[in-house]
A protein has these predicted regions:
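Mid-to-C-terminal Rossmann-like scaffold of FAD/NAD(P)H-dependent oxidoreductases
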Residues: 2, 9, 14-29, 301-304, ...
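Iron-sulfur cluster-binding cysteine motifs and their immediate structural context
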Residues: 35-56, 77-106, 152, 159, ...
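Glycine-rich dinucleotide-binding loop and its adjacent helix/turn
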Residues: 105-121, 180-195, 201, 222-276, ...
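Feature captures the FAD/FMN-dependent oxidoreductase FAD-binding
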Residues: 122-123, 127-131, 179-227, 316-324, ...
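N-terminal Rossmann-like FAD-binding beta1-loop-alpha1 element of flavoenzymes
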Residues: 127-150, 266-274
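FAD-site-proximal beta/loop scaffold in flavoenzymes
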Residues: 233-255, 333-400
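A conserved FAD-binding loop/helix module that cradles the flavin
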Residues: 393-423, 427
Length: 544
């Protein structure tokens, strides 16, 4: 027998008027938030956008979306240090999406299929000179060509690519991969003039009839270090070593090679020395591992190939076949201090990898140009120097020195150059708030192991064959589908199914959903189930 009385309470209308009892205090709206991968990409790629296309197997559309921001995906998939993956929310769940591996897959597939980028604008009648064919110069030239401008790159070297060609070993970046992506930029009408060192920018600007100039010569000169070296000592810079190897002129280093420094370039130099026949490649660094500049995986790869590292040691003297190091010790603040204890190390060659600087003296006499003490050029938010129509970027300006940062500079400069040429200043669109892991609703997700790239066995790493392989199409698809689509709706229909009032209508593929506030009770069922936080609940405005 049921002892409960029947429910005699009236049905309360919660959406249109204030009544006695509950009212709707909030209602849902669809939002777009900024994924952390997008936020941290130095090239400004819309990573989530091209990943969503890759998830659907729309490879060409994904590549076209990617190259709106970066013309070198096959290169970046190999050499970028992928800060996007360090920020990836999926790392809180199991492991980051291998964004760089998918980017590489798209770049390699584009080369294999012969895909070409579209032009976005009619010819403008304007000409732009780009000085330097490195990543920043190539990026700027590509973007300017897409915007309808006539572009010529002039570079002092015999081959385009800058430090991509002469600073990154082929076991990390095969030269055919690099040249294929550069050739695609050339196919857009960009003229690349080699063996042409620009020494008078203003004269070349006037002589060539250029309307603007972008200078991106990079930082290809080794920093001077004051270490006593005897006449018979064989000392080279890491910059010159990698340059010579890239030019096909491998030097003879001997059986024992010491590399001084612990940045990424030092790791490349030591691994290159092993490939050139050195029986022993020893990295010497004045501090400890926690303070090295190289990425941890770079050091691990070097160690796996037999490179040795001697920490807390500072070179004091270099002689023929040997060098003297002083042992260091960290003080209470973590700063290396000399101990007065010395050791002698045997070495046929010493490679100095202590940083690089830009050779910018040819710019110092141009009115309006301002240089920092280390030779970098000061630019404004629009990438323009103090000289009207003269822009600069890449390693030539202060800031982080990576390939991806340089490409981002080139894109940004191109957009500002375009605005300057058209007298329509470029303004970047405002960014949405960033969505963190705590804002996601992920119970529906299960662990999905990442797709691993194959590695060349250590025993076979004697030459400059590429060490890391690419993903198969199936693995690339799996990896793309690990993306959580943080902050942006991917039309999973979860909200549509969860609404108890049928207040949510589907607008069709690619158009999202719409909330009928006449039916919505503000229960937040849609918000609470949305896995990617593409829905927010906002307070209801109730008339006084």
């Amino acid at each position: 027998m049921n002892d409960h009385r029947p429910d005699m309470s009236p049905v309360v209308e919660m959406t249109r008027q204030r009544v006695v009892g509950p009212t709707r205090s909030s209602h849902p709206i669809y939002v777009d938030l900024l994924p952390p991968c997008n936020q941290t990409c130095p090239a400004g790629e819309d990573i989530q956008a091209w990943l969503s296309l890759a998830q659907a197997g729309k490879w060409k559309q994904a590549w076209e979306s990617l190259i709106r921001d970066n013309p070198l995906p096959a290169v970046h998939g190999r050499v970028c240090y992928h800060p996007c993956e360090s920020a990836c929310n999926r790392a809180e769940l199991d492991s980051s999406v291998s964004i760089h591996a998918i980017e590489r897959f798209l770049g390699d597939k584009a080369a294999a299929e012969g895909w070409l980028p579209p032009r976005d604008a009619a010819p403008s009648g304007k000409k732009v000179l780009v000085v330097g064919a490195g990543p920043s110069g190539l990026s700027a030239a590509y973007q300017l060509a897409r915007l309808g401008h006539e572009v010529e790159i002039r570079d002092a070297g015999p081959l385009p690519g800058g430090m991509l060609h002469f600073g990154i070993p082929a076991y990390r970046l095969p030269r055919d991969v690099l040249m294929q992506e550069i050739a695609r930029i050339g196919a857009m009408g960009v003229r690349i003039t080699l063996n042409h060192k620009v020494v008078d920018v203003l004269a070349e600007k006037v002589g060539g009839g250029f309307d603007a100039v972008f200078v991106a010569i990079g930082a290809q000169a080794a920093r001077h270090v004051d270490i006593p070296a005897r006449d018979a000592a064989h000392v080279v810079s890491a910059v010159s070593l990698l340059h010579d190897v890239g030019a096909g002129q491998a030097p003879k280093l001997g059986r024992r090679v010491v590399v001084y420094g612990a940045g990424n370039t030092a790791m490349d130099a030591a691994r290159t020395a092993k490939r050139l026949g050195a029986e022993e490649a020893l990295i010497v660094f004045f501090s400890d591992r926690a303070h090295m500049e190289a990425h941890a995986f770079e050091a691990e790869e070097a160690l796996s190939e037999g490179v040795k590292i001697k920490w807390l040691s500072s070179i004091r003297d270099i002689g023929a076949g040997a060098l003297q190091v002083e042992l260091m010790a960290l003080d209470a603040h973590g700063v290396p201090q000399p101990t007065g204890k010395f050791e002698t190390l045997r070495a046929d060659s010493v490679v100095l990898a202590l940083g690089q600087h830009a050779e910018s003296d040819f710019l110092k006499d141009i009115p309006g140009i301002a240089l920092t003490p280390d030779g970098t050029v000061i630019v404004g938010p629009d990438m323009m120097t103090g000289a009207p129509g003269l822009f600069a970027g890449g390693d030539l300006i202060p800031g982080t020195r990576t390939v991806t940062t340089a490409v981002g500079h080139g894109k940004k400069a191109a957009r500002h150059i375009d605005g300057w040429l058209r007298s329509l200043p470029y303004e970047a669109a405002p960014k949405h708030p960033v969505i963190g892991f705590e804002g996601l609703h992920l119970p529906i997700y299960s662990d999905a192991k990442p797709s691993l790239q194959p590695e060349l066995p250590t025993a076979l790493r004697e030459g400059f064959i590429e060490v890391t392989g690419g993903l198969s199409e199936a693995d690339a698809l799996h990896e793309a589908r690990r993306c959580l689509s943080c902050g942006n709706c991917y039309e999973c229909d979860g909200c549509f199914a969860a609404c108890p009032e049928t207040a949510i209508a589907k607008l069709g593929p690619g158009r999202g959903y719409e909330v009928d506030l006449a039916l919505c009770t503000g229960c937040a069922a849609c918000f609470e189930q949305c896995p990617c936080h593409a829905i927010d609940m906002i307070p209801e405005r109730i008339p006084a």
